[in-house]
UniProtKB/Swiss-Prot annotation:
Main localization (coarse): endoplasmic reticulum
Organism: Ailuropoda melanoleuca
GO term, biological process aspect, one: endoplasmic reticulum to Golgi vesicle-mediated transport
Family: Belongs to the metallophosphoesterase superfamily. MPPE1 family.
Listed InterPro entries: Calcineurin-like_PHP_ApaH (IPR004843), Metallo-depent_PP-like (IPR029052), MPP_MPPE1 (IPR039541), PGAP5/Cdc1/Ted1 (IPR033308)
Top-level EC class as recorded in UniProt: hydrolase
Protein name: Metallophosphoesterase 1
An annotated Gene Ontology molecular function: GPI-mannose ethanolamine phosphate phosphodiesterase activity
Gene Ontology CC annotation, any one: endoplasmic reticulum-Golgi intermediate compartment membrane
Amino acid sequence: MALIRLGFGRQHFCLLKRRSFLMLKLAALVFAVVLFCEFLIYYLVIFRCDWPEVKTPASDSGQKTLKAMFLADTHLLGEVRGHWLDKLRREWQMERAFQTALRLLQPEVVFILGDIFDEGKWSSSQAWADDVERFQKIFRHPRHVQLKVVAGNHDIGFHYQMNAYKIKRFEKVFSPERLFSWKGINFVMVNSVALEGDGCHICSEAEAELIEISRKLNCSRKQERRSGPCPDPQLLPASAPVLLQHFPLYRRSDANCSGEDAAPLEERGIPFKERYDVLSQEASQQLLWWLRPRLILSGHTHSACEVLHGAEVPEISVPSFSWRNRNNPSFIMGSMTPTEYALAKCYLPYEDTVLATYCVAAGLLVVLILVHSELLPSPFLFGWNLLRKFKT
C-alpha cells in the first residue's frame, strides 16, 4: 500500500513539475514578445536612421548645424470618437517612437506640423485639458530640446469652425510664436487655416502678421520690396526662411507623388479641393511672394510628397506620425545651416510587422500547449521518428 502511495506521489510531483515548466516557458515567451514589440523594435528600427550631411560642412563654413525633427498629424483621439483601446495602442506607439527618437537621435528642436489633436475643433474645456495632458506626457522632452507646434484644422477647426476662443486656447498651450530663429536659421510657422482670403477678422490678423514678418525678413536681407523702412535695431539673420504649416501649398493632386509612403495609387489622381485639401492658389502665391522661403514643410495629407514651386522652392509633405493614419509612419530629419540644408526620412516600425509578430507568438503558444497536453507530438520526437523511417 505504501509503495502504491509513493508511486502516486511521484507521478503527481512529475505532473506538477511538467506544468510548472510549461508555465515558465509560456511566461518567458510572452515576456520576450511583449518586450520586443513594445520596446526593442523601436530601438532596432530608429537606430538605422542617421542625420544627413549638408553639402558644405558647418565646420568649413564657420556655421553651426541645427538638427531639427519634423513630424505631423499625430491626431490624439478625444472623448467622442476615441475608443479606449484605439487610444491606448496608437498613443503608446507614438510615445515609444518619439521617446526613442529623442534618445537615439538627440534633435535640438522638434516641429509638429498641425493636427496634434483629433477633436480640438469641438472638444469641451475639460476634454481639451485632458487631451493636452496626454500630449504633454507622450511628447515630453528635455529642457534643452525645443518643441514647436503649428495649428491644424483638427486643432482649431476649419475656417468656418475656428474662432478666437479656440485659437487662444491653442496658443495658450503652444505659444502664438510665428517667427523662430536659431543658429542663424529663420522658421516661419503659419496658421494656414486662417488663409481663407475672405477678409474675416482672424484672416486679416494672420495676413497682417505675415506682412510684418515679410518686412523683417526683407530688412534682414536689405531688400525693402513692399516692406517699408527698416528701423529695427536688431535684424533677423540674413537667411531665407523655412516655411512650416499644416495645409500644403496649392497643387492639383498627388498624381506626381511617389514612394512607399505616398498616397495609394488609386487616390493620387483625385483632384484636391482648394481651402480644404490644400491652400488656394492665391494664398499660395502670396506666401511665396511675401516670404520667399528656401524650403516648405507641411502636413495634412497623411502621405508623403515632394513638390517644386516656381522651379526653385521645394515643398515636403510630411506623412502622419500615427499608426491610426498609416501602416508605415515616419518623420523628417533635417540638418540645417543658414545657407544649406539636407533632409532624410526616418521610418517607424510598421504596424503589420508588430501584429504579425504577435500572431506568430500566439501560434507558438498554442503549439506548446498542445505538445504538453500530448494532443500534438513533440516536433523533436516527430523529426526523430521521421528520420528513423527514412533510414529504414
